[in-house]
Amino acid sequence: ANHPIQFYAATKRSNELMAHSYSHMFQIPTTGLRFFTVYGPWGRPDMALFKFTKNILEGKSIEVFNHGNHLRDFTYVDDIVQGIVKTSRNPPKYDPSFDHFDPDQGKSSAPFRILNIGNSNPVTLMRYIELIEHNLNLKAKIQFLPIQDGDVEKTYSDISRIQSLVSYTPNTDVEVGVKNFIKWYLQYYHQTEPK
């Protein structure tokens, strides 16, 4: 995103630009990886899947922004790991076709690249919640709220470049991923069934 609309995105982009400068100055092969809505076991407890699962199990309401109209490219953690491993085995190289007098924004004189790692199949937030409900066999109490400032309505990862470079293919659809997470969550927190 060359025109970020929030500080979080701006910090990510500035990190990529600093990494490019470092790669250029010291000719260190560098790959920036952009992860798209990572979820799964051992994830961050402040993320939606954790918060929604915990609140549904405790009978508390969940806050759903943009009145549930978000689309997210949910990517299961195993698919992220696959992308990292494959990418690490194929470092970027200097592009001899780069022209300093007529620079193409998609190329670099440094051994540098940015790759998206995602599922490339956006799912509605409401579908995601339905899958959580189904796997818990409980209904969520939903509090619909307007979209938050700086939030985007849809995320979608174009994974064509990582597919062509390292044969990355996401293998986990959201139905399987949410099911795996719920099973892990219940075992980890010693709950065999919802309260």
Residue spans of the language-model regions?
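Catalytic helix-loop patch of NAD(P)-dependent Rossmann-fold dehydrogenases
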Residues: 1-32, 43-44
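Charged/polar positions on well-ordered alpha helices
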Residues: 12-13, 17, 21, 25, ...
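Proline-glycine-enriched beta-turn/loop adjacent to the NAD(P) cofactor-binding site
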Residues: 36
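Rossmann-like NAD(P)H-binding beta-loop-alpha module
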Residues: 40
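C-terminal substrate-binding subdomain of Rossmann-fold SDR/epimerase-dehydratase oxidoreductases
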Residues: 56-195
